[in-house]
UniProtKB/Swiss-Prot annotation:
Pathway: Cofactor biosynthesis; adenosylcobalamin biosynthesis. Gene3D superfamilies: 3.40.50.880, P-loop containing nucleotide triphosphate hydrolases (3.40.50.300). It comes from Synechococcus sp. (strain ATCC 27144 / PCC 6301 / SAUG 1402/1) (Anacystis nidulans). It comes from the Bacteria. The keyword Transmembrane does not apply. This is Cobyric acid synthase.
């Protein structure tokens, strides 16, 4: 069965987006395509229709391919928890926590078995598999236990593209150095080089490309220009780069950049709004006076809550809320807004009872059982009757202590979230809540009303359509500069 692989000289070379673009380009040719990443380390996750957890990047690639995301597309997901530990998600289910030095000893064999099983299933269901590597395939200290790079390519005998970020500088050294560190059987799989994030005129680069091809015997199959668009990111470090000021912005939203922030793809739809400026606020930053503050999800809610309190930002958020500011919490952020979080089993590695922000009269109990499911419900607030979709990824259950009529359910299922009658405090377990265009606009209009701004129209669709346009724009931008014909013809 035909398969391609994309590996990179470094992290952040653009593997995920180029893989997504290839998936869309093959789909346009009429093929049924599946993305694949054997092992991903990320805190942005997605829940499949079967209730399994995979990396959000593989879900994005599946949407690019026009297929439903499944757990086979990312059989191993590692979710860092700090202190060199990660939660291990195997075939969609969390199976434990492990230290970095223990991971390969405990999970290498079972992990490779899961990868092979997943590939076998994808081969049965699809015409093409487009595989993505992780980091670099030439990490000498890790190669013997690398599950997700050229071991996969060798298993599939997949021709492989070696991608380099030319914007960082040193791209020729990166490519030659990577090749030199590969074993001969690995090197034979590299069928083309791709330069990514190029700024400038290709003719000024041509002499270097000619030298590279002559030196290695491997063709340069792509020089892809810098694409100045906002695409989903897997690394919270990239949030530091999202500092563009919008001249037409009328509303500012401060998202707290927790040390272990998770699922920050929740805010892509907000960033797509021309009238909204999203500002990511670190623990040492000033909160300022935004129109709303959002507490996002976290992989280690208790540790992030303690860091938030130690930094003084927790008190700043309480003061902001007391002055009538709008605060919205998603998942772990929702849990933080309550009275207490109780983790009597040490689910996150710390046992005990912990003070929340006391914005909601709620208690949250952590248990080993993890809630993973897609949800469909109907909104009650800020606009009743809106159909809502999203997904839950959380450990712990939250209960409202008070029978006070001051707090109301946001959705038909009261367990999914609540708000106060004034519309100042909001909390929900639903990831993807802002993907619901009408609900997003209704919530933004509540902020705009306070500033005396005209309401935005709410008759807009789901963010899925906008995301699909974004994928098309990505693929259109890549297609003229990436020559896949030699690989496709050979296969």
């Amino acid at each position: 069965m035909p398969a391609l692989m994309v590996v990179g000289c470094t992290s952040h070379a653009g593997k995920s987006l180029i893989t997504a673009a290839i998936c869309r380009l093959l789909r346009r040719q009429g093929w049924r395509v599946a993305p694949f990443k054997g092992q991903n380390m990320a805190l942005n996750a997605y829940v499949t229709a079967s209730g399994g957890e995979i990396g959000y990047a593989q879900a994005f690639q599946a949407w690019a391919a026009g297929v439903e995301p499944t757990i086979e597309m990312n059989p191993i997901l590692l979710k860092p928890q700090g202190d060199m530990t990660s939660q291990v998600v195997l075939k969609g289910r969390a199976v434990g926590r492990t230290l970095a030095e223990r991971y390969y000893q405990d999970y290498f064999e079972v992990g490779w078995e899961a990868i092979c099983e997943a590939l076998e299933q994808l081969q049965a269901d699809y015409d093409w598999i487009v595989c993505e590597g992780a980091g670099s395939p030439a990490e000498i200290n890790l190669k013997h236990r690398d599950l997700t790079n050229l071991r996969v390519a060798k298993h599939l005998q997949a021709p492989t593209l070696l991608l380099v970020d030319i914007d960082r500088g040193g791209s020729f050294a990166h490519l030659i150095g990577t090749l030199e560190l590969l074993d001969p059987d690995e090197r034979s799989l590299i069928r083309g080089f791709v330069f990514n994030k190029f700024r400038g005129r290709r003719e000024l680069l041509q002499s270097g490309l000619d030298w590279l091809e002559e030196r290695t015997g491997i063709p340069v199959l792509g020089v892809i220009p810098w694409i100045d668009r906002a695409f989903p990111s897997e690394d919270s470090l990239d949030l530091m780069e999202r500092r563009r000021r919008k001249t037409q912005a009328e509303v500012t939203i401060a998202v707290i950049r927790l040390p272990r922030i998770a699922n920050f793809t929740d805010f892509d739809p907000l960033e797509s709004e021309p009238s909204v400026q999203v500002r990511y606020v670190g623990l040492q930053d000033e909160l300022g006076y935004p129109d709303a503050v959002i507490l996002p999800g976290s992989k280690t809610t208790i540790s992030d809550l303690l860091d938030l309190q130690r930094s003084g930002l927790a008190q700043a958020i309480r003061d902001y809320a007391a002055a009538g500011g709008t605060v919205l919490g998603i998942c772990g952020g929702f849990q933080m807004m309550g009275q207490h979080i109780l983790d009597l089993e040490g689910t996150e590695g710390i046992e005990g009872q912990f003070e929340g922000l006391h914005l909601f009269p709620t208690q949250t109990w952590f248990t080993a059982e993890k809630t993973l499911r897609q949800r469909q419900t109907t909104a009650r607030s800020p606009q009743a009757g809106l159909p809502i979709t999203g997904y839950e990824i959380h450990q712990g259950q939250t209960r409202l202590d008070s029978d006070s009529e001051e707090f109301l359910p946001i959705f038909d299922d009261p367990k999914l979230g609540l708000c106060d009658r004034n519309g100042n405090l909001w909390g929900t377990y639903l990831h993807g809540i802002f993907d619901n265009g009408a609900w997003r606009r209704a919530w933004l209009n509540s902020l705009r009303h306070r500033r005396g701004l005209k309401a935005l129209p709410t008759s807009i669709g789901h963010y899925q359509a906008q995301r699909d346009d974004l994928i098309d724009a990505l693929s259109d931008a890549v297609e003229p500069y990436l020559n896949l014909s030699p690989l496709l013809t050979a296969l």
